[in-house]
Amino acid sequence: MLSQLRQYHPVIELETVAHLLKSEYGDEQERAQLGQLGLQIVNRYDGYECPYKALFEAAVSDSKATISHAAGLHYSSANDESHTNDTDNEHRDDNVMKHLLSGKYLEALALLDANSKMDKSPFKHMEQFAKIMIFSRNYENVQELELRLQYSLSDDRIDQISKDQQPSQNLSDEKESICRIKLYICTSYFIEGRYFECSSKFYKFYIEDPKTMMKILTSKVDGDALLLLPELKTMIAASTLVSIPMNSYDELISIDELTELFDTVDILSRSLKLLINTSFKCFLALWNNEFQKTLSRCYLLNKSWETAERLMKMKIYCFYLKLSKTLTISYLSEKLGIEYDEVKESVERLICSANLYFHLDGDVISYSKRSIVDSTVRTLDENCRHINELLDKQRVRNDKLKEMISGNLLEEEQTIRKSDTAKTSNNQEIMDIDDVQFLSDDLEQVDSCISD
């Protein structure tokens, strides 16, 4: 496992080491080796802050084991010629890598665009763009590349690209870049848990160029991979098994155009044969061993694997429920080699989430026939309860609104009354002053007459 890590793209290499350490992978010596590898990646590119540096240092310091080259972890430094060739591959310089390792994806894209102006290979640039979008978890942009590929692969565009190619470039390299972009599209769907899209797109892309796709699936990765070959093949197998109905497995494995693919993706062909023969216990042993071991340790795929793992078991439970109106949890547990409690919990969740016509009574799973009318009545009852709840909430809101309006009206009425009282008092005061003034004028007139 450890000796394979250098095949990854440095960003995935770094994240995988951190993921393994966080998940308590391996014994003390293996963890120390991982910590040392992480520090080597950090030191490979100076001038950036790694968020995992303390994690790597702790793994090394916690171990008293001596880490030697014999352990299979001799990683050359940045000055190593072979490693320099890896980092320079596809116009990736130290500055771009520092931005990627620091999570500064927009800055990395800007530098990548600057480099691409000197590169006449649009598909190489598109391939690097897809990688950065996956690093930044912008899967929608990755999936939109399918439309860009369709435009770029039109006849007139292909002719122009062929004319622009430098002597060192060839059509085979371009085709490999195109196929890798398509595989990144499939990977983005799997990461999102969209297994049907992952599977259907892969077979579509495979039929479009089986020769180049087979070359990628059988060639050794070059130290710039997002997924190792076992991870890529297992992802294809898992998405196929989860998304395609069981009654279509026989038809799928019989397609002549896919014969070479099934020979190469051996884990898929073995799984299909076991499922077609209803050897579920043997299949689940394979599922819980090879599938689990490969995908659970993969930094990009481990979270979506957890969902796929549950869905596949649900499909097998459904198969048994279709065959029998009555069966027991203990029978399924023994037949499938799964713990009793796990089977019971999964079956209960399946019946509830899928609204199946089954009920669980202790150990017994029984079919309970329900008419369309019963289902309709239950739906109407649920809707009625929901409507009544909404009406009750609305009544409470209306009552509060009435109280608020009544309070406001009362306050307004009291304010008006106070205002009228104040006006009346003021008018009376004005009248009294006028009377006094009038009386004063009369007295002055009387005094005038007496004087005369």
Curated annotation (Swiss-Prot):
Q: Does the keyword Cytoplasm apply?
A: yes
Which part of the chain is the PCI domain? 205-374
Q: According to the lineage, what is the superkingdom?
A: Eukaryota
Matching InterPro entries: PCI_dom
GO CC annotation, single = COP9 signalosome
Q: Which UniProt keywords apply?
A: Cytoplasm, Nucleus, Signalosome
Q: Is Cytoplasm among this UniProt entry's keywords?
A: yes
- Report the locations given in the UniProt record: Cytoplasm; Nucleus
Subunit note: Component of a COP9 signalosome-like (CSN) complex.
What role does this protein play? Answer: Component of the COP9 signalosome (CSN) complex that acts as an regulator of the ubiquitin (Ubl) conjugation pathway by mediating the deneddylation of the cullin subunit of SCF-type E3 ubiquitin-protein ligase complexes The CSN complex is involved in the regulation of the mating pheromone response. PCI8 may also be involved in transcriptional and translational control.
Name the record gives this protein: COP9 signalosome complex subunit 11
Q: What is the lineage of its organism?
A: Eukaryota, Fungi, Dikarya, Ascomycota, Saccharomycotina
